[in-house]
Amino acid sequence: MSNNQILFERAQKTIPGGVNSPVRAFRSVGGTPRFVSRAQGPYFWDADGKQYIDYIGSWGPMIVGHVHPEVLSAVQKVLADGFSFGAPTEAEIEIAEEICKLVPSIEQVRMVSSGTEATMSALRLARGFTGRSRIVKFEGCYHGHADSLLVKAGSGLLTFGNPTSAGVPADIAKHTTVLEYNNVAALEEAFGAFGDEIAAVIVEPVAGNMNLVRGTPEFLNALRALCTKHGAVLIFDEVMCGFRVALGGAQQHYGITADLTCLGKVIGGGMPAAAFGGRRDIMAHLAPLGGVYQAGTLSGNPIAVAAGLKTLQLIQAPGFYDALTAQTKRLADGLAAEARAAGVPFAADSIGAMFGLYFAERVPTSFAEVTKSDTERFNRFFHLMLDEGVYFAPSAYEAGFVSSTHDDAVIDATLAAARRAFAALAA
């Protein structure tokens, strides 16, 4: 029995399902989860000592690779001064200033510890600001595990075939309206019917939790116009795509400004950190200035702030995003070419340093199209690549991530492995 199997059996005795986040359990793809012992650059090693090329990167944060020496040094410097204070620090101001500089729509920002906290707090703030209750979200978009957002969500819910989580009261779900992603007509119809009841529209401008699905410019521009017309707050959930698709995130890529933005992953540099921010007049409703309460014992934790601040500084290097985008595109295009050569129906897409793999005839644009992908074939591909030492997301409904340490040799090795995997699928 492998060490991974031993650890998984042991974990299941004290941890529900043996994992602390459902997708890690390999329930979708089958088999035994890999227990990580260490990581460096684009690689990690499992409990059996096997090396893998990592295309998850802790689900997005590791944009400069695992254990970047400058991030490590920044964390080591603050450790000796204390782990957590429950009081403000100068470093919190510095990371806030950096975020506001990089995302111009954010005039003020508040740090929290997770993406769920960020989206949950942003929605409460939008409701407090507008005095309205209804929120609009989109099918397949995942915004964390707050009750009102677990209605027809993506990520683990989609992976496990449960569109809405058990335990979400009907009285809460009734305030959430779910529309089809990228469907402008449905959006216009909803605003026409109850636009003046809508407190906020929350959207992943680049969805990464029903695999990678891009918001179309027409859809996102319609969102902006309708929210402005009806006085609703437009919330861009950029927890995943923020600092991933461009230095200024999806708002820079599309040239569209949100009222509130949720960030996470990259801004913690691998540590637990997230944030929400936006227009000053909206943020002024947060306690202690206003009546919308939000708090957190570990918000602005000095260790997380140190890792995040150094990461934000590193990604501003000249040419960083040009190189990262080109490398991610080379991976996606190369995988599609290998599949074509083997005669396997397959499509791939990338934007910035995010990519999507689809066992389908074309790149999907909606939740409905995503669910038509051949998940059985994906599962076989996943395990073939795992055997080759390449670690993709263990679900057909999750995006992948490339770091600045995924150099040509790493991409070449991945494509060579994929050539063998696609050949086996076609046999």
UniProtKB/Swiss-Prot annotation:
CDD domains: OAT_like. Keywords: Cytoplasm, Isomerase, Porphyrin biosynthesis, Pyridoxal phosphate. SUPFAM superfamilies: PLP-dependent transferases. Pfam families: Aminotran_3. It catalyses: (S)-4-amino-5-oxopentanoate = 5-aminolevulinate. Its EC number is 5.4.3.8. Homodimer. Belongs to the class-III pyridoxal-phosphate-dependent aminotransferase family. HemL subfamily. This is Glutamate-1-semialdehyde 2,1-aminomutase.
